Amino acid sequence: MATINQLVRKPRVRQVTKSNVPALQACPQRRGVCTRVYTTTPKKPNSALRKVARVRLTNGFEVTSYIGGEGHNLQEHSVILIRGGRVKDLPGVRYHTVRGALDCSGVSDRRQGRSKYGAKRPKS
């Protein structure tokens, strides 16, 4: 335990935690323009064609964002909203596209978990 005199001379240093989503710069979401929309394959035990987009954000960052859900309407120059959240089996993908916001449409025919995919409530 440090004495009060020691703490006056040299105060305790706060530990700085590194952000998992640096491109958001402490914002909940960021807007950006798709520069490339493509599919990529996941890490070893899994196998698929995951849909991702390279996005140039309004703050100048260029990041890779995962496009969740079945089917999408994104192409180059689409304006999208991204949020934090990594994809465990895609190295370097730390952001998710927000479905149903800006140019990105919601998932059609989605019945459960609709809010995560920007799907409206179906007519009974």
From Swiss-Prot:
PROSITE patterns: RIBOSOMAL_S12. Disulfide bonds: none annotated. GO terms for molecular function: rRNA binding; structural constituent of ribosome; tRNA binding. InterPro entries: NA-bd_OB-fold, Ribosomal_uS12, Ribosomal_uS12_bac. The modification 3-methylthioaspartic acid is found at residue 89. The keyword Membrane does not apply. GO terms for cellular component: small ribosomal subunit. Keywords: Methylation, Ribonucleoprotein, Ribosomal protein, RNA-binding, rRNA-binding, tRNA-binding. It holds the Pfam family Ribosom_S12_S23. Residues 113-124 have a biased composition (Basic residues). GO terms for biological process: translation. Residues 105-124 are annotated as: Disordered. HAMAP family: Ribosomal_uS12_B (MF_00403_B). Belongs to the universal ribosomal protein uS12 family. With S4 and S5 plays an important role in translational accuracy. Part of the 30S ribosomal subunit. Contacts proteins S8 and S17. May interact with IF1 in the 30S initiation complex. This is Small ribosomal subunit protein uS12. It comes from Colwellia psychrerythraea (strain 34H / ATCC BAA-681) (Vibrio psychroerythus). The lineage of its organism: Bacteria, Pseudomonadati, Pseudomonadota, Gammaproteobacteria, Alteromonadales. The gene is rpsL.
